[in-house]
Amino acid sequence: MGSKTPEEQIPGGNGGPPSTGPSSSGGEPRGTHLSRDGDGSLGDHGDDDDADEDDVSSRPLRADVEEKKKKKRPKKKKKPAAAKEQSSPPRVPLSDLFPLGEYPAGEDLVYDRVPQPDANTARTTTAELRYQSRKHLEDPALLNDYRKAAEVHRQVRHWVQEAVKPGWTLLDIATGIEDGVRSLLANQGIEPGDNLRSGMGFPTGLCLNHETAHYTPNPGQRDVVLQHGDVMKVDYGVQVNGWIVDSAFTMSFDPTYDNLLAAARDATNSGIKAAGIDVRICDVSAEIQEAMESYEVEIRGKTYPVKAVRNICAHDIKRYRIHGGKSIPFIRNNDQTKMEEGEIFAIETFGTTGRGKLYDDIGVYGYGLLHDAPAQVRLPFASANRLCKTIKEQFGSIVFCRRYLDRLGLDRYLAGLNCLVSHGVLESYAPLADIKGSYTSQFEHTILLRESSKEIVSRGSDY
């Protein structure tokens, strides 16, 4: 889920000083090991020279009975237990597929260079103090939560890539994704607190063509049907105990747009490769733009250079907060802010054949509690107070959409939502689009900046 650049803000504002020099320019397939019982083999008795030994009539009766007892019937071959596999659509809980509760790690990349901290004479630097507060990133339980969320994302998107075809409505696709996520997590998210334990990290984004980010089908909107010539961005998050995996990909059914998709995929991988401890934001941005703008795409006989989108950014992630505060633009900038050990980033990129600057489109994608919202606020409507209580119990600071309120059985909530937005309790997110007639693409991964390597936790065999 992209972080929108504030209006009129020059990229380079993560709190870092301006640059004084030039910028330097994703589990193995699972099955269960099946065991079989071998046939009991008695073998052949050796011959004996004593002929009397072979004469059955000369044996005592008791010995004959004992001989019968010794004979064993051949064991029946046991049928191998059926290997547990994910269904289509995905509905088998992950706990059934991973009975030990251990989930596959993402791709592990060693840092290109050893981080060199700035020289200072303080006994404990502010960076070290910040890291101490993020030491939990090496906690096995946290890592397993992240890997579980990533495995859910991989299995659900595998179904999307295999099953979704032109003719599907965006509502059917979004519902299929979200039903799959909830089924794999074995949590339908109905009771208070359920959605805080696990569930969607934010509403499923399904953006066609010039629509670039933050669109999801909501109640009252017309059905949008996927066409063969559409370019669809699929962006959704999965969270376990508040740790959000944010990953996105682009689908098209016409090879005309292959280069547009390749540009965003390459730019995202370039950003991931450049990212690391003590790496400056401006250096990651430069690598992203260089990769993105090395591509062009021919559409209906006209060649378009692929541009990096200017006013939406990659971002860090905090617990229960999809946008943590740091931003990584897709264009060169002077931001000297450093990435730090223990941080979590959603490295994403958007490419476009349009202007490269997005505008707010009509409608509302979703809502989220502002992290600095007042704890107590006087609202003019009792319904708004009840709605606020429900949102805090069900979602906390996780972004949600109106479809999610419908699932909970709420109605007549629009006035309450508008009231909460106007009183600074909720933030609303608008769809973002480039000029009509243009096409955009997106790819995204979540990475963990661990002590000795970066883990691309959402990496799969697909991208």
UniProtKB/Swiss-Prot annotation:
GO cellular component annotations of the record: cytoplasm
E.C. number: 3.4.11.18
Disulfide partners: none
Annotated protein name in UniProt: Methionine aminopeptidase 2-1
Presence of the UniProt keyword Disulfide bond in the record: no
Localization annotation: Cytoplasm
Entry's cofactor comment: Binds 2 divalent metal cations per subunit. Has a high-affinity and a low affinity metal-binding site. The true nature of the physiological cofactor is under debate. The enzyme is active with cobalt, zinc, manganese or divalent iron ions. Most likely, methionine aminopeptidases function as mononuclear Fe(2+)-metalloproteases under physiological conditions, and the catalytically relevant metal-binding site has been assigned to the histidine-containing high-affinity site.
Basic and acidic residues bias spans: 30-45
Biological process, per Gene Ontology: proteolysis
UniProt binding sites for a divalent metal cation 2: 246, 315, 348, 444
Keyword rRNA processing recorded: no
Main location per the UniProt record: cytoplasm
PROSITE patterns per UniProt: MAP_2
Binding, a divalent metal cation 1: 235, 246, 444
Pfam families attached to this UniProt entry: Peptidase_M24
